[in-house]
Amino acid sequence: VIQNFIGAPLSGLLYATAIVLPFVLNSLGYLIAAIFVFMIPAHLISHGSSAETDVAEKKSFISEIKFGLNYLWNDRPLRRLVATTTSLGFFYSLSTSTLILFITEILEVQAKYFGVLMAGAGSGGVLAGILTPMLSKKFGRGTVLAVAIFVSSITVLFQGISPNVWVFGVIGFISAFAITNWNILLMSCYQVLIPAELYGRIHGARRTFVWGVMPIGALIGGVIAHSGLRFPLIVGGIATTLISLSAFKFVYVLGNQTSQGDHEPSLKENS
């Protein structure tokens, strides 16, 4: 949400001023973050951790990832949920890889207004952040999750066939609202599905999958865009819609059961 409200409008203005400025400032942001990390006193790192943490830190990165992947594979509901989110992440990345070109060249929006358009979509995320708990309580977590995964998927397709920027903006608002609902409630599901003492390792392995496929999706999206800037959104939208339909019942059941804190063994029986 902050990315869309502040980052996107600022990047649009910078892009309009000089095409290299967004990239320069983005790199500068990483540099500043690295400086702050090095400014953390060493004694806080070496003496501020617990014995359990110290033991965990001795394990290699590969062994941690291996443990997480094994856990994900052996837990059927968690495995299917990760497979669903990974495939969605891949096609979302594919569909949005050339979004700025679609907006500026097909919808004919000036580059300096690109961020304003994204901020409008971000307002849907803000509204969802306020309403998601109420919607979940009123309609049930499973219902909201299932509807959110479908709406956030099919809106990708609708964006690809948008005739003008106004329609695109409205669809973007709806999409951001649905995606934020999905993300908030999805994290609640993970907190039930993954034991607290293992959450870091399992969640890290999950993110390795989800974020690992996104650059590949973006690359393929760029290739597809050579056939037309609408194509990535249309292809990605069709794929995400089919994935959401295939996962609709699973997500509905999973959401309702995790809202009761239930995982073993009923979730495995219904997966």
Residue ranges and their predicted role:
Residues 37-55, 180-194:
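Juxtamembrane interface at the ends
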Residues 16, 40, 70-74, 92:
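Residues at helix-coil transition
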Residues 1-48, 119, 123, 220-223, ...:
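Hydrophobic alpha-helical transmembrane segments
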Residues 24, 83-84, 204:
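Phosphate-coordinating loops and pocket residues in cytosolic domains that bind phosphorylated ligands
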Residues 1, 9, 60, 77, ...:
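Amphipathic alpha-helical recognition patches that constitute DNA-binding helices
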